[in-house]
Amino acid sequence: MYIAADAEACVHLVERKVLLHLSEEEKEAVGPHRWVLDTGAMNHMTGSRSVFAELNTGVAGTVKFGDGSVVAIEGKGTVLFACKNGEHRRLDGVYYIPCLTTNIVSLGQMDEDGFKVDIESGILRLYDLQRQLLAKVHRSASRLYFLDMNIAAPVCLTMHVGDVAWR
């Protein structure tokens, strides 16, 4: 993981439609690879430091959630996902909030970034910038959209050429 402390920033977010703590039913549905595709969240957020491919720890501040709780932001970065077809996709602008027990993808932020979000008849479809289908997710019984995504570890490839000439 790449960690940078440059470009320090102090942010104060308000997430009125996001709760810090889930209901018992929702807790059972959430796992480490599960992300909530949230129409009410204004920002991508996670409480798991290990998911970041890049993390700028110079970004700090607070976020106030809908239940009134205020917690610390300890970074902002990029999460790299491994798709089923072997490709990797980046999710940029993800806040690291250690107290958060859920991984959240803000559909509003995705729309702002040029992605297409389509929700119809209990099915959410997410399209990339080229309008290729990225995800098709059925609404859960708790009226949330959960997507299981595999985190890709960034790989640094190097090559060393010695003094031996090719023959």
Placement of each model-derived feature along the sequence:
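Gly/Ser/Thr-rich beta-alpha loop segments that engage phosphate groups in nucleotides
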Residues: 42, 68, 77
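Short active-site-adjacent helix-start/loop capping segments
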Residues: 44-45, 72-74
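Acidic/polar residues in short coil/turn loops that connect beta-strands
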Residues: 67-68, 85
